[in-house]
């Protein structure tokens, strides 16, 4: 039956079928302008996921900043003068980016057990690993043995350090209740473009510091941007493949 339909309808009316296909193609092409890709922190989690609900609760209660995470494994020891200077240089370079709010590294952690002074004095005038008048070995061991910082800003073996890059809050839409859907979507698209540009900028910085050790980039903004890039690329490749096949 399918063969008869193909022979009697399609093969005998090639022009009509071609016109119908072209109309369908142009119709789908016209409405494709309304196709949107979304990859935000919430879309990366399943709706109803307990982790997502917990994230919403914490965000509503305390507020939050988006952030990126870097891992830094220096070529030399973590507390060698070269590694510390390189980490400081990397921090200041990232912090100079206009979309970065702050950068937290191993060198910003207060050392409270690095001297024998009274606790109150140590709290008021705490030292960090970047200070020259401290025992770096003792300070590093304090951080490494801390249940608060171990596996958070420093790996258990002491070879890899974490870097937190806090991103400035996005400017909210003013009078959102008076905005049209198109204006809101345009604002979202602008934020996505800014996020993509931010990821490109920090990757350029990381690339320029590749000689000091191994540096990796992570964080939800990066994952979201990479997902968007990969999906767009796959859509183009798949679309061209189907077009060539047809």
Question: Which residue stretches match the model-derived regions?
Answer:
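Charged, often glycine-rich, active-site loop that binds/positions anionic groups
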Residues: 88, 113-130, 228-236
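Extracytoplasmic
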Residues: 60, 130-246
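Acidic-histidine catalytic/liganding microenvironments
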Residues: 13, 97-100, 209
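Signature of alpha-helical transmembrane segments and their immediate interfacial
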Residues: 1-37
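Solvent-exposed, non-transmembrane loop/terminal regulatory segments of multi-pass membrane proteins
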Residues: 34-78, 84, 130-133, 137-153
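Envelope-exposed proteins and targeting segments
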Residues: 66-68, 99, 159-161
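Hydrophobic C-terminal alpha-helix "anchor/cap" residues
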Residues: 10, 94-95, 206
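Short amphipathic beta-strand/extended segments in non-transmembrane regions
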Residues: 71-73, 88-112
């Amino acid at each position: 039956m399918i063969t008869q339909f193909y022979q009697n309808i399609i093969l005998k009316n090639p022009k009509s079928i071609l016109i119908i296909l072209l109309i369908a193609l142009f119709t789908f092409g016209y409405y494709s302008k309304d196709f949107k890709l979304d990859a935000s922190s919430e879309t990366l989690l399943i709706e109803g996921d307990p982790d997502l609900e917990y994230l919403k609760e914490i965000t509503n209660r305390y507020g939050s900043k988006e952030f990126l995470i870097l891992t830094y494994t220096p070529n030399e020891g973590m507390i060698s003068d070269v590694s510390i200077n390189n980490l400081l240089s990397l921090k200041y370079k990232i912090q100079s980016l206009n979309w970065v709010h702050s950068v937290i590294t191993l060198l910003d952690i207060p050392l409270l057990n690095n001297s024998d002074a009274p606790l109150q004095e140590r709290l008021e005038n705490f030292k960090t690993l970047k200070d020259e008048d401290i025992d770096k070995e003792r300070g590093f061991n304090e951080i490494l043995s801390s249940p608060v910082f171990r596996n958070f800003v420093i790996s258990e073996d002491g070879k890899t350090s974490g870097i937190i890059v806090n991103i400035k809050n996005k400017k909210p839409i003013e009078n959102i209740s008076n905005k049209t859907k198109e204006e809101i979507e345009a604002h979202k698209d602008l934020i996505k473009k800014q996020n993509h540009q931010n990821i490109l900028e920090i990757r350029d910085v990381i690339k320029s510091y590749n000689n000091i050790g191994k540096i990796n980039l992570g964080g939800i903004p990066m994952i979201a941007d990479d997902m968007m890039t990969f999906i767009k690329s796959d859509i183009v490749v798949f679309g061209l493949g189907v077009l060539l096949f047809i």
